[in-house]
């Protein structure tokens, strides 16, 4: 079956100290009948640069995709929840202007394009895809678990 789960609320990530905080608002998980799923939300935050990190600009709220999944039903039970890997590994992305190119290899991957595009404005886009950095093995999303109970 198909399903939609919506959460109300906001969480903030101070990814690079206080220089480029961002926040995720009202995430929504949509699962189709075949088990493919997408986690979307609104993102907002502040942008900065390495050249002048003390100057921050407030970025407009933007709808984005946080994660995509191939088959969530393979990792659990429809009636109670699941844990599934994201589509990070092997995903292609077009880096925002001024960002390093995406590289291949065993750790090639990317967070969803809209998420990377938003972070082109924060100055941290290359943190969210394989860019050839030593940290590339650490950029992949961890498996996501969603657990619930169904009330008829």
What kind of feature is each model-predicted range?
Residues 1-152:
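Primarily mature extracellular domains of secreted and cell-surface proteins
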């Amino acid at each position: 079956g198909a399903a939609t789960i919506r959460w109300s609320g906001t969480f903030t990530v101070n990814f690079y100290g206080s220089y480029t905080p961002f926040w995720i608002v009202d995430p929504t998980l949509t699962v189709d009948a075949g088990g493919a799923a997408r986690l979307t939300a609104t993102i907002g935050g502040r942008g900065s640069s390495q050249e002048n990190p003390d100057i921050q600009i407030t970025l407009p709220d933007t709808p984005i995709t946080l994660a995509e999944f191939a088959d969530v039903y393979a990792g659990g039970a429809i009636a109670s929840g699941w844990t599934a890997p994201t589509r990070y590994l092997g995903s292609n992305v077009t880096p925002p202007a001024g960002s390093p190119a995406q590289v291949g290899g065993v750790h090639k991957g990317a967070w969803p394009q809209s998420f990377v595009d938003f972070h082109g404005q924060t100055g941290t886009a290359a943190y969210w895809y394989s860019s050839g950095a030593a940290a590339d093995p650490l950029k992949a999303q961890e498996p996501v678990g969603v657990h619930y109970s169904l009330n008829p």
